[in-house]
Regions:
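Acidic, Ser/Thr/Pro/Gly-enriched alpha-helical scaffold modules and adjacent low-complexity linkers
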Residues: 2-439
Length: 439
């Protein structure tokens, strides 16, 4: 299925970038901010008018890693080069270029994921020159935190490349904070002296990588609901925009709407030009494609294409129960135009979480267990019949066939006791229903 795509990328198993439907591996305990930083520059090919990306700086060096780890990372670096300059190699030197921040995900063969955070900028200097990319690879999913880190990196880069090392070394040695906590990094800058940089981790860990502002700036509330409907049924969805930062922020925002469920299929927030054949895959995907590639994807008749162009299959407005659609729209109307990122995240996440509470929040009552410690068995039929309304039943019957629900319920079957924010919201909803009945 991906033979053409894989031939372009590798012949050395670096297809890890596009590993297809694999259950997401359990999250590893994160103890540090990042694994390594690379600087990717554009070097002109000899005798040709094109450029090729190349790594000009890395911290820490691969030489400091064990051999097996070094070999794996060398494969990853080939993919990283593509994602730092996804447009390809047809660049011309520039005198002005507004810096932009974007991200991508590296998926390992076992389903575990690492995040690539990028800041692309024009290096300090005179005359026309090619932009360069600073890319941080991390197990941490926290876009806002790394945007602030890049601000500090960029500030030091304008002074000297050598100023980046001590800052990144201090960051690497700092412990990764718990949700809601702050860590302070000391860093020296000539003429400014020692600065203390405070990095605060968001309290809601599943929203660390998310800023919903871009999504709702690009799409209306009604369009967001149509995209959400396509996503919960695991369809093929392509997002298109000119800016890399818009693509990565929109894709991560859409994936976050699924909480407590997790997208289990191909997820590429920015598709490099050489990988554009991925749009022809018959399996579900969430892809971000730059607008100049519109002709390569628009003829895919059963694909939902969003952001700059909205091409839908046609049934999106009928997928979600009508009453719950109205409730979602009402909840989204509660946000203010001048809301902070945190305020908007709260309104949006709670609105969509409430949707799942009302449609599938009764799942635990339909997992039969022979004893407390034994794995349970999910009773699909009784679960579907127990839906509050007929419209919800129709949606639930379709939703339980998705891989994201299947993976979620497998975890429920394995673990007798369930804790977490979703379960807390279910308990609150069930308690409110009891009080209503008692009136």
């Amino acid at each position: 299925m991906f033979s053409t795509l894989q031939d372009k990328l590798h012949r050395d198993r670096s297809d890890r970038v596009l590993t297809l439907p694999q259950p997401t591996a359990p999250a590893l305990a994160v103890t540090s901010f990042f694994e390594y930083l690379v600087v990717v520059s554009l070097g002109k090919k000899r005798g040709q008018g094109t450029y090729e990306p190349q790594i000009t700086y890395q911290f820490p060096k691969l030489a400091n890693m064990e051999r097996s780890q070094r070999e794996e990372e060398e494969k990853s670096l080939k993919a990283i080069l593509l994602f730092c300059f996804p447009e390809g190699v047809n660049w011309a030197p520039l005198t002005e270029y507004p810096s932009e921040t974007f991200s991508f995900v590296l998926t390992e063969v076992d389903g575990s994921r690492r995040n690539g955070y990028c800041r692309r900028l024009l290096p300090h200097g005179k005359g026309a020159r090619a932009p360069e990319v600073y890319c941080i690879i991390s197990r941490v999913a926290c876009f806002g935190l790394f945007s602030k880190i890049f601000d500090e990196v960029e500030k030091r880069r304008q002074i000297s490349m050598a100023m980046i090392y001590p800052f990144m070394q201090s960051l690497r040695e700092a412990p990764f904070p718990a949700p809601g906590n702050t860590v302070q990094i000391k860093s020296f800058i000539p003429e400014s002296g020692t600065e203390i940089i405070s990095l605060t981790r968001p309290l809601d860990s599943w929203l660390e990588h998310v800023d919903f502002r871009t999504l709702f700036r690009c799409l209306t509330d009604e369009e967001v609901l149509k995209v959400f409907a396509s996503t919960v049924l695991e369809r093929r969805i392509i997002f298109m925009a000119e800016e890399l930062s818009t693509l990565s922020q929109v894709l991560h925002a859409v994936a976050a709407l699924l909480y407590p469920f997790t997208w289990q299929h191909t997820f590429i927030s920015i598709v490099p030009s050489v990988l554009i054949d991925v749009v022809m895959a018959p399996t579900p995907y969430l892809l971000g494609v730059q607008r100049n590639k519109l002709d390569d994807v628009i003829d895919q008749s059963d694909v939902c294409v969003c952001v700059c162009v909205l091409c839908l299959i046609g049934d999106e407005s009928t997928i979600l129960p009508e009453k719950l659609q109205e409730e979602l729209l009402q909840a989204l109307c509660c946000r203010r135009d001048n809301s902070t990122s945190e305020e908007l995240n709260k309104v949006v996440s709670e609105a969509f979480l409430s949707f799942f509470v009302k449609t599938v929040g009764h799942f635990s009552s339909h997992v039969k267990r022979s004893s407390g410690r034994q794995p349970g068995v999910f009773q699909k039929k009784s679960f579907c019949k127990a839906s509050e309304h007929k419209a919800s039943q129709h949606f639930v019957k379709r939703f339980i066939q998705t891989q994201m629900f299947d993976i979620f319920i497998q975890e429920v079957e394995r673990r007798p006791t369930q804790e977490g924010f979703f379960h807390k919201k279910i308990a609150e909803y069930q308690e409110s229903k009891k009080k209503e009945k008692a009136k």
